[in-house]
Amino acid sequence: MALPPYDPNFTLAFSYGRRDNVFENDPEHDESASAAIVAVELISSARLALKLDSVRTEYSAQYLVDKAGSRNLRRRRKLTVKDCLNFALKKGGIPRAEDWPPLGSESKTPSSYEPALVSMKGEVIEPKDMDEVPELLVHQSAVGAKLHVFTPHIELQQDAIYLPRQVSMRATLDLEMG
């Protein structure tokens, strides 16, 4: 998926608070859309690395928002990357970007329209702790990571990296070497 042009007015979408009382800072940029973009980028990277696609292929993030997102409306929560990947695998695939309206498009496809799906199979693996991560990195073709950024702590550390107490020294060394 091609990156959008630089927008100096863009602000990151984030939420804070308990799950039943979530506050968002940017109504224009949605968490679910961001998760769908990351998911299709992971899918594209994995398919290219496994030589299932001969060139980098753009897949439809909007399809994931429309289809996987409609399942989450009943539960009233935002999509995550894991939700998007699980949906694509359960569905058996997702369409290419050109076969579905672009992300953020107001136009909707007719309910009877069924695009050709590019077949997908695999599994979403989430490690329980940092000790499982090196094993996954060796054996998996595409890896996504959730990064928590603590801006106030970075500023307090004079631009150094903040490491919470829960992170082991071994994990710190692996990150520095990797």
Swiss-Prot record:
Which intervals of the chain form a coiled coil? none
Q: Name the chain's protein.
A: Protein HEAT-INDUCED TAS1 TARGET 5
The membrane spanning regions, by residue number, are: none
Gene Ontology terms describing biological process? heat acclimation; response to cold; response to heat
**What does the UniProt function comment say about this protein?**
Mediates both basal and acquired thermotolerance. Involved in the mechanisms necessary for quick response to heat and subsequent heritable transgenerational memory of heat acclimation (global warming) such as early flowering and attenuated immunity; this process includes epigenetic regulation as well as post-transcriptional gene silencing (PTGS).
Compartments (UniProt record): Cytoplasm; Nucleus
Keyword check for Zinc, yes or no: no
* Family named by the database record: Belongs to the heat induced plant HTT protein family.
- Output the Gene Ontology cellular-component terms: cytoplasm; nucleus
Report keywords, A-Z: Cytoplasm, Nucleus
What does the record say about induction? Answer: Target of TAS1 (trans-acting siRNA precursor 1)-derived small interfering RNAs in response to temperature variations. Up-regulated by cold (at 4 degrees Celsius). Highly up-regulated in seedlings exposed to heat shock.
Question: Mainly resides where?
Answer: cytoplasm
* Tissue expression summary: Expressed in seedlings, leaves, stems, inflorescences and siliques.
Record-linked InterPro entries? Papain-like_cys_pep_sf
